[in-house]
Amino acid sequence: LPDLEKTTKNFADFGLIWEPRDIVGGDCYWSIKFEKKIWFGLFDCTGHGVPGAFVSLILLSRLMRSFQEAQNDSERLPSKLLNNLDTTLRESLGQNNSSGLRDDGADGSIIQWELGSSKIVFAGANMPILIQKGGKLSEIKGVRRSLGYRRSKSLSEFKDIAIKINKKSRLFIFTDGVTDEGRELDGLAFGRKRLIDFLSKHEKSSLSSLNQLLKDELDDWRKKKPKRDDITFVSMQPL
């Protein structure tokens, strides 16, 4: 995973919850700065524990190689990186034919922005982004398609979405372990609406404070019930 201290310096404010269900897991994040631009990606790989961590290591390796081999700006766009990752992850996992026993992959998203710019570029693979701006919280969904799975090979390509932001805008991306977290009493999932209401309620909090509040909220929701999944929640305020 990227050096968190270096990653934090690329943002006006930054917060992270990263909690594998086991000692290691399938949630992973990626960030890089290149020529006054920042990229940040979050991925939710198949499985938990060692199997999930194995897929995440392959994914991060292929993503970094794709970025390093890019010849120009267009090849570093989030959609292009996701399209390449879909292909190379499937190849690395041996899932180009229908006879294999494995069918692993990931959901994910990549954000790109130029320092000081008033827009970001987002592409999502079955993972949305939440934008908080001017007292309003909006959800922008990615393509309904995952990365690497056999079944995703024939689906439409990923698309870049340009999103206007300002210096006070806040961006949130998260794995489904956050919204799927089960309540101790009856197993009810925490849910997307409850998360959005929580973020709206705490829009004045710093992102580090917000993430601690969310962690406490999820812990209180779950109580002594074991985690269902790996949990990752990323909050960002671009410079």
Where is each model-derived feature located?
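… and, occasionally, acidic/histidine-rich disordered N-termini of signaling adaptors
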Residues: L1-R170, K225-L239
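C-terminal catalytic subdomain
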Residues: I161-I173, V178-L239
